[in-house]
Amino acid sequence: MKRTHILPGGQLTLSIDRADLPPDELFALGARANPRRAFLFVSKVLGKHWPVTTATLARIHQMLAAKLPAALPAPVLFIGMAETATALAQGVFEAWLAQHPQQEALYLHTSRLRVAGAAVLPFEESHSHAAQQWLHLPIDAENRRRFSTARSLVLIDDELSTGNTFRALAAALTPHLPALQETHWLCLTDFSPPTSAAPPCHSLLRGQWHYRASGKAPLTPPVRERAITIADSGHGRLGIRHALQLSEACFADSTIKAGERVLVLGSGEYLHPPAVYARELAQRCGADIYLQSSTRSPALVWGAISHKRRFADPYDAGVPYYLYNVPPDHRYDHIHICHEHPANTALRESAAALSAKLIQLT
């Protein structure tokens, strides 16, 4: 299947070679204010720019986990990429654990933020609007053991364009993984060029794209991010060996009724704990729960993006965040904004603007 799309800044030709699901179920097209790449594939199954149900999330996680070889040498190290793929990757990790309960494994995700007291491996994401990110090295003794003795490495992102980010991360990891035998790449959509040098790549869709700019792409003004450190919340930056469980206190004050429409919002890269919260909420109250997140991604109002608003920087790092496709006339009965640290002024203001409830997950 081959289609050509006219975007605000140019022309995109998209060829789909293989798809496990109809492409229209996986993504739609958007445009963004980024001269490195002026378009984006707006995922319909991630819970970032587009709301997704918890049932859809679970289905996608299980499909991707099942694509990995059945007999990966253990310990298996799973790494998810910030900002966009943190919930996808941790969901895949948990689905894989359920499929292989006897295997030793460890999950980590990269971060745009520094955790206080933890050593990091820096690397760059070449096409991103926020190129710098870090992988934190585990502190817990058992997590360190599984990390340093890992024999299989699984790198997970939502989309693969060139493979350069995975290569940069793998190069940074090489001195720390002396026992490594196998590497696998896992993603929703694989648009990387075919190369014999790449590890096995498992995806739900394989294709190619070619973009021809027709003029200068809109440019987002550069942001001077403040150098801050955060406390670790124990949800993945420093490693986790099991499926995430939230405390009962997170659900103690719920007044949601069966049949109501509820939007659960994550904050930037903090999305998997809100996904777990959304799943638990759906099971407990029988409401129609949708998941989405604020994001640093500077998209334009075009195509799959029908509405855009500035949103809280939950970490006070001076970074603009955005929330997409939640217009003033939205049809949700409740909105819950989930966050990992005590709410700052910006989060309280965003909650007030949406008449939303703030939930600190523990």
Which residues make up each language-model segment?
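PRPP-associated nucleotide enzymes
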Residues: 1-362
